[in-house]
Swiss-Prot record:
Family as reported in the entry's similarity comment: Belongs to the KdpA family.
Protein name: Potassium-transporting ATPase potassium-binding subunit
Membrane topology: Multi-pass membrane protein
Record's subcellular location: Cell inner membrane
Organism: Francisella tularensis subsp. holarctica (strain LVS)
Gene name as annotated: kdpA
GO molecular function: P-type potassium transmembrane transporter activity; potassium ion binding
Organism ancestry: Bacteria, Pseudomonadati, Pseudomonadota, Gammaproteobacteria, Thiotrichales
């Protein structure tokens, strides 16, 4: 138990220590200031901008920024879709893997361009090396960079005033890839290789075991994809077992690096925001609220798993119970990681929009599974994905400012800018897209007989498997309750739709809000006379409960039919 506390403390300290230097670095990159990596990144950026031409030089309005973002995503979608359909005739395919069916290729292409990485296929048998490297790995970089661009555009809109532009998408995209994601990923990949993660394009090995049977050992360019999988909060595994596979996550060191990588950029953006708007206290307040939410989720999930079998009452179980004091739920977990390493990793993964797992979520106790759902259901704002976590949290921040100001009889304002009705419309649009999307698609799937046939469990747990799939898809997480066989035409198409709506619907609202904020006057006098101090402890509490009440209650009835009912059924066995 002491070792678990030490690991947790080390993890939190590491994230806190990374936040300021990485946040400052991101600030310098997007403010065109000198950085230590200019010598490496600038040549790539020059070639990239030369290819784009004039479109990369002019500042863009919110509408132009969003149009460029969508145009890029459409091109990326077509590119990935074609490769997945034709991978059977493309090179670097030693296993002779055939092209995907159109519904599955559609689902996979949407999944990777939206930074979801939902996988209705098994990586080692469903995708060639060529597709892994040129289609999926590339999207791991650029889809993460797209989320980062949106967050930076939003931060600019708060810092700037009385102007119409929020930056240039194409320029921001290049900076996100060449200055931030690519250099850090290279370092992480090298560490992974030294830890035993393979990086090759060899055919799978056929070996004879001591038992006299033949075993197939997969190979591939794993280290390079694994690095950006975590750093870009993508989560799509090279193997079906994801980070439970010893080739993806062979040691405790790689497990720790993956967890830190998942939170690194999202945590740093809180400091970037504070530094950019000239109020670092505001950034640390955001960091603090995120951290408290994370700790609560981790504690509940860990306790649920450490005592996950206490409800069993047979004599044999009672004999063991009397010896160890409690029964931990080790089903679906790697013995080399144990319960705490598993719950810590999966709390990190579901809090961010990563979706990578080092244990089987479907085997978790119902309450632990519910916490994984809640981490996503509140909008992935517990640090969250690269960029997406920050702009999701900012929507709740705006709502808390609006509610708090009205409660004390003041006109709502944030950092000297008046918050008006139009701003709140975009805020609520962003916050309501997810629950509407999830509840509609889950309700439809729950009454379709063909979907029932894809479930390995019935009743409340079967409903939880369906609910989890659409929560994960709409929030661009990508993790799953594996009891749902997702490779059907209906699930491939509807989950793809939920991913598109959850990603681009929210981005549209965020960028439109940014377009509104950037035009406003910034009155420091207004900020000073306002009684609502947005850096105070009381405001932090207001934001905390706004997230829980608005984010959590919208999905609570569905949770009642799924994991809560599932837990009650177990308690009365």
């Amino acid at each position: 138990m002491i070792s678990n506390f030490i690991l947790f403390a080390l993890f939190i300290v590491t994230i806190a220590l990374i936040t300021k230097p990485l946040g400052s670095y991101i600030f310098r990159v997007f403010n065109n200031e000198r950085t230590y990596l200019d010598w490496l990144a600038k040549p790539f950026q020059r070639v990239y901008l030369l290819v784009l031409g004039e479109s990369s030089k002019k500042e863009q309005t919110a509408k132009a920024y969003f149009f460029s973002l969508v145009s890029f995503s459409v091109m990326a979608f077509i590119f990935v879709l074609v490769i997945l359909l034709l991978q059977g005739i493309l090179p670097l395919n030693p296993q002779e893997i055939k092209g995907m069916s159109f519904p599955q290729a559609l689902n996979t292409a949407v999944s990777f361009i939206t930074n979801t990485n939902w996988q209705s296929y098994s990586g080692e048998t469903g995708v060639s090396y060529f597709a892994q490297m040129l289609a999926l790995a590339v999207q791991n970089f650029v889809s993460a960079a797209v989320g980062l661009c949106v967050a930076i555009a939003l931060i600019r809109s708060v810092a700037r005033h009385e102007t119409a532009t929020i930056g240039n998408f194409w320029n921001d995209l290049g900076k996100g890839v060449f200055w931030i994601l690519l250099p850090i990923s290279i370092v992480i990949a090298i560490v992974y290789i030294f830890q035993g993660v393979p990086q090759n394009v060899m055919a799978y090995l056929h070996v004879h075991t001591l038992a006299g049977t033949e075993q197939i050992i997969p190979q591939g360019p794993i280290a390079s994809q694994e690095a950006i999988k975590s750093l870009g909060t993508n989560g799509g595994g090279f193997f079906n077992a994801n980070s439970a596979h010893p080739y993806e996550n062979p040691t405790v060191i790689t497990n720790y690096i993956q967890m830190v990588s998942i939170f690194a950029i999202a945590a740093a953006l809180t400091y970037t925001f504070g530094k950019w708007v000239g109020n670092t206290k505001q950034g640390w307040l955001i960091f603090g609220v995120m951290l408290v939410l994370f700790i609560i989720s981790l504690v509940v999930m860990t306790i649920s798993e450490l005592h996950g079998l206490d409800f069993l009452h047979s004599k044999d179980i009672q004999d063991i119970y009397g010896q160890v004091g409690h029964l931990s739920n080790m089903e679906g977990k790697e013995s080399r990681f144990g319960v705490f390493y598993s719950t810590l990793y999966n709390t990190v993964s579901t809090s961010a929009s990563d979706g990578g797992v080092n244990s089987v979520l479907d085997s978790y106790s119902p309450l632990a599974g519910m916490m994984a759902m809640l981490n996503m259901a509140i909008g992935e704002v517990i640090f969250g994905g690269v960029g997406a976590g920050f702009y999701g949290f900012f929507m709740f921040l705006m709502l808390a400012v609006f509610i708090g100001s009205l409660m004390i009889g003041r006109a709502p304002s944030f950092l000297g800018k008046r918050i008006e009705a139009n701003d709140m419309k975009w805020t609520m649009f962003a916050l309501l897209i997810f629950p509407c999307c999830v509840l509609v698609f889950t309700g439809l799937a729950a009454v379709i007989p063909s979907v029932h046939q894809t479930l390995t469990n019935s009743g409340a747990h079967g409903f939880s498997e369906i609910l989890y799939a659409y929560i994960s898809g709409a929030n661009n997480n990508g993790s799953a309750f594996a009891g749902l066989s997702a490779n059907t035409n209906y699930l491939n198409i509807t989950i793809a739709l939920s991913m598109l709506i959850g990603r681009f619907g929210v981005i549209f609202a965020v960028i439109m809000l940014a377009g509104s904020l950037v035009k406003k006057k910034r009155s420091l006098q207004m900020s000073e006379i306002s009684s609502l101090d947005t850096t105070s402890f009381i405001f932090a509490i207001l934001v905390f409960f706004t997230i829980l009440l608005i984010g959590g209650l919208t999905i609570f009835p569905a949770l009642g039919l799924g994991p809560i009912l599932d837990q009650l059924n177990l308690n009365f066995l």
